[in-house]
Amino acid sequence: MKEARMLTNPTLDQMQALGLTGMAAAWRELTEQSGTNELSRDEWLGLMLDREVTLRADKRIRNRLASAKLRFAQACIEDIDFAAARGLDRRNTMALAQGQWLTAHEGLIITGHTGTGKSWLACAFGRQAARLGHSVLYVRVPRMFEELALARLDGSFPRLIDRLTRVQLLILDDFGTHTLSDQQRFHLFEIVEERYQRKSTLITAQVPVASWHDLIADSTVADAILDRIVHNAHRITLRGESMRKQKSAPLLTGAENGEINQP
């Protein structure tokens, strides 16, 4: 590979000009390592392409995570503590982490009392979805309704609705903090109708699913919304006292328990 070493500078310039930063980095490392003279041209090219592919994949994940706006940006599946005292099933949780529910456009519902780690767990699944190649968006439901109401006034409603319905995984955090108004019912139905069997939606709530009908208030609209949200959704129920009361306990550790039900 003596000829290759002689062409290092112009070759690097060309790679940088083409945006092949991964290949350029691999080239530099290979030329500095001993023993690389024994590699064939195909082996050099393969190593360089591997680096470029990895770099671009990492960049896409970073971009998806930046767009997701996760509340707990560092939450990840690997950090869940599956202590026996908790009861959160490792097998079922890791099965969900494989992402088949996302490709099948199914939902995920996480319920539990305040402070039990619902939002953190939702963000961990959001990060995992981004790793698997899915676009993700996290929103708090009360804030979403505020933004939708304002969007109707300033003309940006179609653009905001499109953003909420187009993303491959929409995380709706803190659903059920209040009874929905007529406008909020309409907005929620608009979102779930557009997403039904096309995209995946993850919802967290303090109140159990059995109480959601009353929160939506209008019986006909509630039936329509819940039929689209609940029937094809996996469920996780977190139990235990608020983790905010456990001074040194990390998220999803300590006394809470969890159950996962398949749809």
Curated annotation (Swiss-Prot):
GO molecular function terms noted in the UniProt entry: ATP binding; ATP hydrolysis activity
Keywords: ATP-binding, Nucleotide-binding, Plasmid, Transposable element
Binding site for ATP: G112, H113, T114, G115, T116, G117, K118, S119
CDD domains reported for this sequence: AAA
BP-aspect Gene Ontology terms: DNA replication
Domain of life of the native organism: Bacteria
Family classification: Belongs to the IS21/IS1162 putative ATP-binding protein family.
Protein known as: Putative insertion sequence ATP-binding protein y4bM/y4kI/y4tA
Organism from which the protein derives: Sinorhizobium fredii (strain NBRC 101917 / NGR234)
